[in-house]
Amino acid sequence: MTRKKLFITGASGFLGWHLCGAAQLDWDVYGAVNRNRINIPGITVLPIDLTDRSSLKDLMQDLQPDAVIHAAALSRPNDCQSNPDASFAVNVRASLNLAEYCGALEIPCVFTSTDQVFDGLNPPYNESAPVSPINLYGEHKVLAEKGMGERNSNAIVCRMPLMFGVAPYAESFLQSFANTLQAGQPLKLFTDEIRTPVSGQTAAQGILLALKQGPSCLHLGGPERISRYDFGKVLVKVLNGSEVLLQACQQADVPMAAPRPSDVSLDSSLAFKLGYRPGSVEAELQRVFGL
């Protein structure tokens, strides 16, 4: 029996790499990357500039995928704030073009959005909460969510929380946290930034669940609302380190290009009902480190 084709953008990125691994069980996976010399076992790697409209159109027509997961993004809020044109080209224009081509093929397109579409003033946020971004990254993700839905009735928005884990071609914040602690250096962490984090492995499973179940919007946060500082305390526990190295601070103490919402905890009750099963932060960290 011929397996269906799944096209994943951002395959060399943190989330995309986890998606490629998880999707191979049920799909023939084709992964878009923005550079050559990348090997992801078990998938067909397709180098492409997603901002090149004609190249993307040709690829979609040649590949004829059965579904698409759009995980490629400029995802660092400070970088987006400092480079608005680049952010718009990748996070908005490329997303809308991809949704248009998926609409023409009448196939589902899962879009990985973010908890940064909210202002942090009324958590926790469920799927029906009004969007209210306070930084450019969030604004561009809102534009992409809306525009993709207009271009493809089969578009599925997955709003992602803070994610952590290990991937060969991209890092999450976890590596820098762990490296700092293991080097015996102090680690400053915000007490006033609250998220609902999950591992990259868990996030990938949630996105594939969304593709299978087909809701128009799904939040994929974890079960715990936790600050970065308290996350650090759990990390220290898992790594058998010392909390002495942790230094509490607030967002106002660190100059940043992009404003940050204080509490963008996601209410992921709908995903839980559909079978999404993220573990506690401690359990997820133990899984990441193979403990």
Where are these regions (language model features)?
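Catalytic helix-loop patch of NAD(P)-dependent Rossmann-fold dehydrogenases
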Residues: A89, R93-N97, V117-C158, F164
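C-terminal amphipathic/interface module of NAD(P)-dependent oxidoreductases
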Residues: P259-L291
